[in-house]
Structures are given as C-alpha cells and as structure tokens.
C-alpha cells in the first residue's frame, strides 16, 4: 500500500512504497522531477527505482487495489449518515480510487465495489431484514457475508446505488434495472443493477462484469485437449448450429465469447444478439435486446439476416420463434452459436423438439452441443491430501482463500458431436437414452468423468465435482 493519494500518484506517475527495508520510490521516464523532490521532502529519503511507463501502470494498479475495505468503512458510515448530502447532485465517478468525496455512505459504496472487484466477486447482494441489512458477495459461485450495516443505513445505501445507476430513487414499489460503468484501479467494470421491493425494504443485486475478463481464450477455460480440438473444428464449419448448455452462472456466455474470439472477424461478418451485452468484442457488431420497445431476440435475428452475416451468436434461445429462426439461418448458409438451458448436452435435442422444432430440421442443422459446469479450485496454500481417499485432496481453509478452502474456478465439459448415425436417430425421433448411448459409443464422456482429471491432478475435490453434476 502506498502512502501517496492515488489520484496524485497516478497524475504524477510516481509510487511510494514502505517496508521493512525502508522506502522505495518508483518512477518512470514521464515522472516530473519536482514530484520526486516533493515526495522526498514530505516523507524523507527513499531508494529510487526506475521502470518503464507501462510497468508503472501495473504497479500503481496493484498497490492501490487494496484501498478501502468495506468492513473498515461501515462503522464510520453508520455514525455519520447524512441523507441530505447523499441526495444532492453527486459528481460522476470515473475511477473509484480517484474520488475524494468524504460522504460516509458514498465512501462505503465505493469500498464495497472496490473490495468486490478485488475479491473477483461476480455479484453483490444488499438484503434488508427486520433489524439489519446484510451485504454478501458471490465469489466462485457461492455467497458469503461481508458486512451487516444497521437497518437505518439501508435506505441510504440503496438510494446511492440507484443514483449511480440512474434509477428513480422515489419509486420503491416496483422493480428497476439499471447499469453503472466505472473503473476500479484502472480496470473497467460494468455493473448491472437490479432492485426489487420486499417487506423490509428494497433488495439490490449488482452483477459485476469485468470488461477484461471477456478476452479469455478457449485454451484458458479448462477444456480437455480432445474436447477443445473437436469444438474448434465445429466452430469453423461454414454453417450449422453449435449450442452451449448449462444452468445460469455456468460460464456459457464466456465460452461463446472465447469461441468468437477464435474466429477471424476481419474476413467474416459476425453479429450477436444478447440480453444484456456483457462484454465488448472488437470487430463484432453486438445488438442489445430491449423488451420495453419490443426489441426481442426474434425481431433482432430477422434484422440480422438482412445484414449479410456469416456468423450469428444468440445469447439465449428462449422460445420457439427464436429457435425456428436460428435453425432456418443455419440451413441457409450461416454458422449459429447459441446458449440453451439444459442439464446436459444430449437433452438439448429434446428441449428444442419440445419447443416445437421439427426433428428433421434439427437433424439437418445441428453440429454439436457443449455442456459445462464451473467447479471451484482447491486453494493451493492450504489444501491437504485426503487420508481416506489416497490420490485426492480436500479443502482446509486459510486467510488466502478467506477460509473457504477454494480459490478460483475452472470448467468441466461434455461435447455431444452430431455424426451421421446420430442425425438418423434425431430424424427418427429417438429418445435421450438412445442418443446418449450413440454419443458414448462415438467417444463422448460426461462432465463427471471430465471432472475426474481435475481430481487426479489435485486441482479440486471429489465432492466439488459431485456438487455441480448432481443434475447432469
């Protein structure tokens, strides 16, 4: 942690760090000479360290990323809540660490968002109860309590968030949805805000989307090399449908983005229809669904087909109309990538047939289905070998992993490739069991079987694989 204010250090291109071996002053070619003299005058002698401009950017971001612990701020906020000041015009924040506003509720919200980004939380829950509120983070797919403000502070927190998301702070009876775009220590973060009224006040959930996370490659998603090679072949076909299935929060959209990033947008016309657009993809036209103005998936898809597309990505197939347009698009020379909510890969076929898609159309258009789940990785600092199960490891918990025993996540997958034999079965209206048997004979392995390689390598625990594959 640096002793210099973040805004000043960033502007002057200078970083002061103190430790057991004394103070270190890190500068780059663009650092003004007077700022070095000023820091030494204020803080005393310091060893000078020179780095490149781009190196200093990373050092600044990491040094100040720990600014503002939510738990440390909440006590001060409870003692000096100023609702009148909160409701005044608040200047737009471009980087949370730049703001010098001392309003306690504002500082607490900033601390909550900063800490959530640092902990790589996917969601922040602010939940009102009879006597208190609870703030929880969803990290690695599981919720954990962060802080419990007094009930009197809850309304101020919600109002501040609604102001940032440009929502109506006077409307407390109806659900509202909004968006906040900001930066935390230089990282662009997009926040989707959802409020809903409850018996004890408004409940808020904020979904954090790290813009840099959308740049993942397929190789980083934890796929078995054999699955990766087959999937790579599927998405390079000139036409057909490739589906990604799984429950909410299983990484389906991330996999689709990684697949699109693998394709050449400079020689192909790639368009997407999403709700919402989670990450900006360079060279790709992304269309946002908007139910308020009847901009549905089906309407957007019809418009896209008049835009001379080569590849179409559909955020989710939710109804028969969208499914029919996707199938027709794939049959007329387009590659269609889409997500669907099913428990495993094979059941995607029956889900589309249940929606009303004709089996003979599916047999002609489908290329393959990727089903996936996310499993938590064991913390490498505290995991221990399980004496009851030689060759496997178990979670323990330490300060590094917040005493959960897990840190980070990876994927387990099953890939259902549609060959000629399976096409014939689909055309004949075969059931899931017959399709699964044919897929197994062709070499498909289940998500649970895929997870065994992570257990053998010590990356996760056996019970974690069972937890996420109970319904598969």
Predicted regions and their residues:
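General small-molecule cofactor/ligand-binding pocket signal
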Residues: 47-51
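Short, flexible helix-loop junctions that flank or precede catalytic/ligand sites
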Residues: 98-472
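Alpha-helix initiation and N-capping motif
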Residues: 36, 53-57, 66-67, 80-83, ...
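Charged, low-hydrophobicity low-complexity segments
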Residues: 53-111
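Polyanionic, low-complexity intrinsically disordered segments
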Residues: 1-42, 56, 61-67, 80, ...
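Residues that form generic nucleotide/phosphate-binding pockets
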Residues: 42, 59-63, 73-77, 86, ...
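A generic structural signal for alpha->beta connector loops
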Residues: 43-45, 267
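Core structural elements
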Residues: 9, 79-88, 126-133
